[in-house]
Amino acid sequence: MKRYAVILAAGQGTRMKSKRYKVLHPICGKPMVQHVIDQVSKLGVEKAIAVVGFGAEQVKEQLGSQCEYALQEEQLGTAHAVMQAAPHLRGLEGVTIVVCGDTPLITAETMEMLIEHHMAAKAKATVLTAIADDPSGYGRIVRNEAGHVEKIVEHKDASEQERNIREINTGTYCFDNETLFQALTKVTNQNAQGEYYLTDVIEIIKADGGVVSAYQAPSFEETIGVNDRIALAEAERIMRARICRQHMKNGVTIIDPASTYISAEAVIGRDTVIYPGTVIEGETVIGEDCVIGPNSEIKNCYIGHRTSIRHSVAHDSEIGSDVTIGPFAHIRPLSKIDDEVRIGNFVEVKKSTFGKGSKASHLSYIGDAEVGADVNLGCGSITVNYDGVNKHMTKIEDGAFIGCNVNLIAPVTVGQGAYVAAGSTITDDVPGRALAIARARQVNKEHYVDRLPGKKKS
């Protein structure tokens, strides 16, 4: 049987108190609605329709061709939102799952079970329910003797007995597609809010003799909707724990999951250890047997095997195997660090390459540079790359040795195997295997201090 999906993503989200469109708020680095679409895409749907309203263009920019779009110009309720998908789905045979774009924790596994239960029950509609510790504010599920849905009672309309029911309506449904769009034509807005509600579709289907079933989600957490910053933080916490658990199941050691942030897209190899206070963002790939953290920030990096990054920041760069970075190093975007490199404490690397086995162990800035293999950069080495208008390249060839407190004024090349004496300011190219000394000769003034006014002779 063919499957379709409608993702409700038109709400403004006024309780978020934000300029950002609600469903675009990120959870673990990915917009809420993207989490939902990613899970829906695993269901093998023929069509996925995102119903958009406020911020429609931003949502389209985020989701692109992953789905089709229907515009809800006025937000007149959930049934009205689904009605906007009619031009895409009306008259098609199959089942349609309706899910909210602000439920980022829902999984494909739960939606798959919802669809399978719906089909096994030969239902016209199936409600995804959950057991809530505190069901206040939620619609309660009242079941009949057969276990099907007798009615959905909103909290404000529920009797004392009905309010004791902990099974709630999550707002996710599975419908027979043709039945859904037939019932939508009968929904009215004769209520205090003047809106069209999807729960009325359930009543219409029941009145027409259709079976309305219910499938209970494995956990309430999976079904929560994000309507304010408090719920956003809660969803972030749950998603972060879920991501950490999956990595740990895959063989990654995470010392303290509660203080570790890993994006949904990150890939981490087995036997890697993640220490507390570490943030791994974006599409980062980390190899096996690495040590990351504590207190490190990695974003959109490719990292090889057996690499250590401690108390450091690395963004948008490629880092090889058996590399040591930190503490307190900063690898800025577009850098490429080859195998067996050492980037030590208080070293900043910007848009530069380091060849195999090279070292910059302390207090250096290497920007817009090509550093060859087996190069040693002494403490305080600086590539002076900016002339106030343009950035210029520094090239340091294989085996070069740069002494402490050296300024390399770009554009400049230090040849293969060359030495640069400590304290030099290099403005011209240094030939291979040469020694460059670019500092004034030391002059000692004998008895100078004795001649200063007010100084006693010793």
From Swiss-Prot:
Main location class: cytoplasm
Pathway of action: Nucleotide-sugar biosynthesis; UDP-N-acetyl-alpha-D-glucosamine biosynthesis; N-acetyl-alpha-D-glucosamine 1-phosphate from alpha-D-glucosamine 6-phosphate (route II): step 2/2; Nucleotide-sugar biosynthesis; UDP-N-acetyl-alpha-D-glucosamine biosynthesis; UDP-N-acetyl-alpha-D-glucosamine from N-acetyl-alpha-D-glucosamine 1-phosphate: step 1/1; Bacterial outer membrane biogenesis; LPS lipid A biosynthesis
Record GO terms (molecular function): glucosamine-1-phosphate N-acetyltransferase activity; magnesium ion binding; UDP-N-acetylglucosamine diphosphorylase activity
Catalytic activity, EC: 2.7.7.23, 2.3.1.157
Cofactor note as given: Binds 1 Mg(2+) ion per subunit.
Region named Pyrophosphorylase: 1-229
Listed cofactors: Mg(2+)
NCBIfam families: glmU, PRK14354.1
Protein name (record): Bifunctional protein GlmU
Organism: Geobacillus kaustophilus (strain HTA426)
Lineage: Bacteria, Bacillati, Bacillota, Bacilli, Bacillales
Gene: glmU
